[in-house]
Amino acid sequence: MTFWRMQLHPSDSTRAVAHTTRSLGLGYVGLDFADPLGDLTDVKQQDIDQSQRDYWDFAHCMDVGDIILVVAHHYPCALARVTGPYNYIRAPEVELGVWFRHFRKIEVLGYYADIVTHPAKWEKTTMTDTISILRDPDGVSHQLISKWLAKLGE
């Protein structure tokens, strides 16, 4: 099981929480590109802009059972478990309520504000990229996920 950190909003950060909660409520996490690329299973990692190469990992490295710390405005928002494979649609459908073309089905394990109810006590998890694999078990986000899973009895 791999731990991930992810933001769920397009470039419009003024609606980050709205996009995040809507995506989670629908049971999906996803991402997209400013310069559209197609299905990531058909794309070589080196063909993706350097600033977005981590997106390739979403299709090729993320597995069912992996855990995602969803972040909004540099604070933990939710913890989710990946329950489905990588999917791609050519164009997002507004009726579906998602803005992204690259997505995975998830199960929300919990919301951070339900565990730490006083915002002044929230742990800041500065995040400037859209998605990243958490490789350092001593890192703040990795430790937060481990503690959260322990509270959930997982």
Q: For each predicted feature, which ranges?
A:
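Short coil-to-beta transition motif at edge beta-strands of beta-rich domains
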Residues: 57-70
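Short, flexible beta-strand-to-coil junctions
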Residues: 9-11, 71-75
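Short, surface-exposed loop and linker segments with low hydrophobicity and enrichment for Pro/Ser/Thr
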Residues: 1, 60-63, 97-98
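Compositionally biased, charged N-terminal/linker segments
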Residues: 1-59, 149-154
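C-terminal accessory regions
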Residues: 64, 73, 77-78
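Beta-strand-rich binding-surface signature
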Residues: 3, 67, 103
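Aromatic- and Lys/Arg-enriched surface recognition patch
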Residues: 75, 81-139
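Low-complexity intrinsically disordered segments
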Residues: 137-153
